[in-house]
Amino acid sequence: MATPHINAEMGDFADVVLMPGDPLRAKYIAETFLQDVRQVNNVRGMLGFTGTYKGRKISVMGHGMGIPSCSIYAKELITDFGVKVIIRVGSCGAVLPDVELRDVVIGMGACTDSKVNRLRFKDQDFAAIADFELVQNAVSAAKAKDIKVRVGNIFSADLFYSPDPEMFDVMEKYGILGVEMEAAGIYGVAAEYGARALTICTVSDHIKKGTQTTSEERQTTFNEMIEIALESVLLLED
């Protein structure tokens, strides 16, 4: 049954959904990598598609920017459409000197300055971590395709334009691999509702070095990250 934000029916979505922030990236993924594709959502322009990858039913849908937006879609997909696995495929900024543009980062854990997980976890610190099998499968898929990946902590920020640039020095000190805006929220929603989640990001800009990719590149050329996510789904145990 349709929700306020997703005009689909039960069965329209696969049990695994890849979620980029940009709905146009979702469209690109569906048209480039999936077969037998059909559109299953268009509410508020947040495009969703279902198709098959090497015979495996998979869906892809945008989640927008920030924890509030992605949490709405993740919650509804899990509770109203039976989704069991969410893999965020997005972009991130880097702060470490040895992390470069287009490097692929797997978010094993997600630090955050957001308070949403404290709200759902009785004002205590919740360890927002990815599902172990999903991490393991992503690493295995990357090795099989000879794609270098970095695995570790990322940071989910509430503000894109940070008023405290010194925080980036703290992130560098603590070895944060990437800075984005959603993973901690998705991990919290997955834990609350009994699903599994993973975040895979491609470095789109380096905060310290001042280098960046274009919006068109972010939309259509981060293919290694997508290939890792799709191949990792094929390794899931039933």
From Swiss-Prot:
It catalyses: a purine D-ribonucleoside + phosphate = a purine nucleobase + alpha-D-ribose 1-phosphate; a purine 2'-deoxy-D-ribonucleoside + phosphate = a purine nucleobase + 2-deoxy-alpha-D-ribose 1-phosphate. The record marks R218 as: Important for catalytic activity. The active site is at D205. Its EC number is 2.4.2.1. It is an enzyme of class 2 (transferase). Signal peptide: none annotated. InterPro entries: DeoD-type, Nucleoside_phosphorylase_CS, Nucleoside_phosphorylase_d, Nucleoside_phosphorylase_sf. It comes from the Bacteria. GO terms for biological process: purine nucleoside catabolic process. GO terms for cellular component: cytosol. Phosphate binds at G21, R25, R44, R88, V89, G90, S91. Coiled coil: none annotated. Keywords: Glycosyltransferase, Transferase. Transmembrane segments: none annotated. GO terms for molecular function: purine-nucleoside phosphorylase activity. A purine D-ribonucleoside binds at H5, E180, M181, E182, S204, D205. CDD domains: PNP_EcPNPI-like (cd09006). Homohexamer; trimer of homodimers. Belongs to the PNP/UDP phosphorylase family. Catalyzes the reversible phosphorolytic breakdown of the N-glycosidic bond in the beta-(deoxy)ribonucleoside molecules, with the formation of the corresponding free purine bases and pentose-1-phosphate. This is Purine nucleoside phosphorylase DeoD-type.
